[in-house]
Structure formats: C-alpha cells, structure tokens
C-alpha cells in the first residue's frame, strides 16, 4: 500500500509539472530561433567597426527580452507594435536620414485615435504642414495623387484622411528600410547583447 501511495503522488507531481515544462520548452524554442537568426547575421556584424555603439539608453536595452526581439524579426508590423521596437527602428532610420517616415506613421496612428472633431482638424493641419505640403521640413515621399487627395480632405478632415499616405509610407519602410534594419549594427548588437554569449556557441 505505501508503494501505491508514493507511486500515485509521483504521477500527480508529473502532471502538475507539465505546464511548467511546456513553458520552458517554448522559451527554449525562442532562444534557439534567436540564436540561429543571429548566427546567420554574425558575418554582417563582425565586419562592422567594433568601436561603434548605439545611442539607446541602458534602461531601454535592459528591459528588452529575447522573445520580444524575435518578434521584431517576424514583420514590420510586430516591430511597430512594440514601443521599444519603435524607438530602435527610429534610431536606425535617423542614421539613414529618413526618420520622417516613422514619425509620420506614428503621427497618423495618434490622429486615428482622436475622437474630438476640433482636435482632429487641428492635428490634420499639423500633420499636413509638417509632412505633406510641398517643401515641408519633414516631407515624406508620396505620389502627387495621394498628396492632392490629402490636401482636398483638409477642408473637412476625417479619420481616414491620411490612410492612403500612411499605407504608402508603411510599404516603403517594409520593403526598403526594414530589411536593412534587420542586418544593421544597431539591431544586431542589441539582439546579441540580450541573448548573451550563447549566440556564438
């Protein structure tokens, strides 16, 4: 009888531990994915100057996790969902003198979350003057038709006024800037730092 009791207890213990084992396996898989990705990118990293460093604050870097960084490599959309991702991507775009793209995209996100009609009109004018109008300080690269459509909508701006322009800039970043970001020194050094020395193992 004592043998049966202890056998049953051990069985229960195994069942109780399974959720922990599943979570541990998921974390292990994430780590393997990140390790493999970084290994494939290390040749790019090692050809860069070792003396260079990013300007991100240490507090921002320390709170990131390998899981989150892996998400950034899946799509631009997943990168932009993360505030830290936005910050690092903006830093990269700034190094390429194209930070106006993400600034415009973020301004549009804020604009679409605005409920008050008067505030909407005010924000629409600010976005137009800063990013859309000819010779704007941070003029974005959109076609004439889209620019003209936004200009007409300013008379009675709606939530969708900048949708086409925002989509155009997102596609531009997705096809042009994002692939380079994933191979950039800014991203690779950050990712390697958060995964530790196991990347090279």
Curated annotation (Swiss-Prot):
Q: Which GO terms describe its molecular function?
A: GTPase activator activity
Name the keywords, alphabetized: Cell membrane, Cytoplasm, GTPase activation, Membrane
Q: What's its membrane topology?
A: Peripheral membrane protein
Q: Which residues form the RGS domain?
A: 75-191
Q: Where located?
A: Cell membrane; Cytoplasm, Cytosol
Q: Name one GO cellular component term.
A: plasma membrane
A Pfam family per the record? RGS
Query: Which SMART domains did the record assign?
Result: RGS (SM00315)
Query: Where is this chain primarily localised?
Result: membrane
Statement: the UniProt record of this protein carries the keyword Cell membrane? yes
Query: What role does it play?
Result: Regulates G protein-coupled receptor signaling cascades, including signaling downstream of the N-formylpeptide chemoattractant receptors and leukotriene receptors. Inhibits B cell chemotaxis. Inhibits signal transduction by increasing the GTPase activity of G protein alpha subunits, thereby driving them into their inactive GDP-bound form.
Query: What is the recorded name of this protein?
Result: Regulator of G-protein signaling 1
* Species of the source: Xenopus tropicalis (Western clawed frog)
């Amino acid at each position: 009888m004592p043998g049966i009791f202890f056998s049953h207890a051990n069985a229960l213990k195994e069942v109780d531990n399974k959720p922990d084992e599943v979570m541990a396996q998921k974390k292990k898989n994430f780590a393997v994915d990140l390790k493999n990705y970084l290994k494939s990118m290390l040749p790019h990293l090692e050809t860069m100057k070792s003396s260079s460093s990013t300007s991100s604050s240490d507090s921002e870097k320390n709170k990131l996790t390998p899981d989150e960084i892996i998400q950034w490599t899946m799509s631009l959309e997943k990168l932009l969902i993360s505030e830290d991702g936005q910050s690092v991507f903006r830093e990269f775009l700034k190094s390429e003198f194209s930070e106006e793209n993400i600034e415009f995209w973020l301004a549009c996100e804020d604009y679409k979350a605005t409920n008050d009609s008067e505030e909407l009109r005010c924000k629409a004018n600010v976005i137009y003057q800063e990013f859309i109008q000819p010779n704007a300080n941070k003029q974005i690269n959109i076609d004439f038709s889209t620019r003209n459509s936004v200009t007409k909508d300013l008379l009675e701006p709606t939530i969708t006024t900048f949708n086409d322009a925002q989509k155009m800039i997102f596609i531009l970043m997705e096809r042009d800037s994002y692939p380079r970001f994933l191979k950039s020194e800014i991203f690779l050094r950050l990712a390697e730092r958060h995964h530790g020395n196991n990347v090279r193992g």
